[in-house]
Regions:
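Recognition helix of helix-turn-helix/homeodomain-like DNA-binding domains
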Residues: 29-44
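Conserved hydrophobic/aromatic packing and binding residues within compact polymer-binding modules
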Residues: 10, 24-25, 35-38
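Short C-terminal boundary/hinge segments that cap the last helix of small helical domains
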Residues: 58-76
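DNA major-groove recognition helix of helix-turn-helix/homeodomain DNA-binding modules
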Residues: 46-64
Length: 76
């Protein structure tokens, strides 16, 4: 099963990790505007979302989705 990440989860995780859009873009190997577009809810390629998700997972983020709710946890 593939777990996807919503734009809201991306921004929640990025902010909780104290990362800028530049930080996430660099760690994911994508452009800063790509991060901004995704977090705004604009369409980006599935491969790009996966790069963003993996960068956040590598930093310890955990994404949850249950009963119509999404969430994120990060290490303290």
């Amino acid at each position: 099963m593939i777990i996807t990440m919503t734009p809201t989860q991306s921004k929640m995780a990025r902010v909780a990790l104290k990362w800028t859009t530049d930080d996430l873009a660099t760690k994911a190997g994508v452009g800063r505007m790509t991060v901004a577009r995704f977090e705004r809810g604009d369409s980006v390629a599935a491969e790009t979302v996966e790069k963003l998700r993996k960068a956040l997972l590598n930093a310890g983020a955990d994404f949850t989705r249950r009963a119509g709710r999404v969430g994120v946890t990060v290490p303290e």
